[in-house]
């Protein structure tokens, strides 16, 4: 027999609890159980959901899991894996949709908020350029490169070529520290100074360089490097 949500005692069923008390009342594994719908012959869907989260050490790693990684778990086939991935992607798109309508960056906090959820859990360093118009509205965002930050790799040409193409008035550069600690390195500072100087020469201001950690960030402009 395959365990389904209806086989769970009624007062413990995630769907019924969501209807009665709202989604915020459910735990992570209960929400996941609703997506999975069925368990296995040996465990309920709630138990399966708990095991999936334990496998990925919670939502943080589940967020970036692949179909192959999910289907390696007993009880998770391609259909369940696709359901989970679709829900995760919808969540990402909903989060981003709030910022796509000409998001305005007035201060470092605005810039960090714009990218924090996308960048704080990345396992590699991503260097991103955010292009703004004269009203400080975001007109484009581009990942310039992925990998350890190095002055020989981050060429200003790659950053400002897109700025010219988009007729941007200014640029904010952002990169993440996978360690979660946004403290700038010597390379971070050198890259920032080089980009700021090139921006002054061509007339497209580097407004800031933000380093993203885990729910925290550092503005190199506030530190005096821009």
Curated annotation (Swiss-Prot):
Zn(2+) binds at residues 175, 177, 188. Belongs to the UPF0758 family. It comes from the Bacteria. The keyword Acetylation does not apply. A motif (JAMM motif) lies at residues 175-188. Residues 104-226 form the MPN domain. NCBIfam families: PRK00024.1, radc. The lineage of its organism: Bacteria, Bacillati, Bacillota, Bacilli, Bacillales. The keyword Hydrolase applies. This is UPF0758 protein GTNG_2548. Keywords: Hydrolase, Metal-binding, Metalloprotease, Protease, Zinc. Signal peptide: none annotated. GO terms for molecular function: metal ion binding; metallopeptidase activity.
């Amino acid at each position: 027999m395959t365990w389904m949500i209806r086989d769970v005692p009624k007062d413990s069923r995630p769907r019924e609890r969501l209807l009665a008390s709202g989604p915020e009342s459910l735990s992570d594994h209960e929400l996941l159980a609703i997506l999975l719908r069925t368990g296995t012959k040996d465990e309920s869907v709630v138990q399966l959901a708990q095991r999936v989260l334990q496998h990925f050490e919670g939502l943080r790693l589940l967020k970036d899991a692949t179909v192959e990684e999910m289907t390696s778990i007993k009880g998770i086939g391609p259909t369940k894996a696709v359901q989970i991935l679709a829900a995760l992607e919808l969540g990402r798109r909903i989060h981003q949709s709030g910022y796509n309508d000409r998001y305005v960056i007035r201060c470092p906090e605005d810039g960090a908020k714009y990218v924090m959820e996308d960048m704080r859990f990345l396992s590699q360093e991503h260097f991103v350029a955010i292009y703004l118009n004269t009203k400080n509205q975001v007109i484009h965002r581009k990942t310039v490169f992925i990998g350890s930050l190095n002055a020989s790799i981050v060429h200003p040409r790659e950053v400002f070529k897109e700025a010219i193409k988009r007729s941007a008035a200014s640029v904010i550069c952002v990169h993440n520290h996978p360690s979660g600690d946004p403290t700038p390195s010597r390379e971070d500072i050198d890259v920032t100074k080089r980009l700021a100087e090139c921006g002054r020469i061509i007339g497209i201001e580097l407004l800031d360089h933000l380093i993203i950690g885990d729910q925290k960030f550092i503005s190199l402009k506030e530190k005096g490097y821009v």
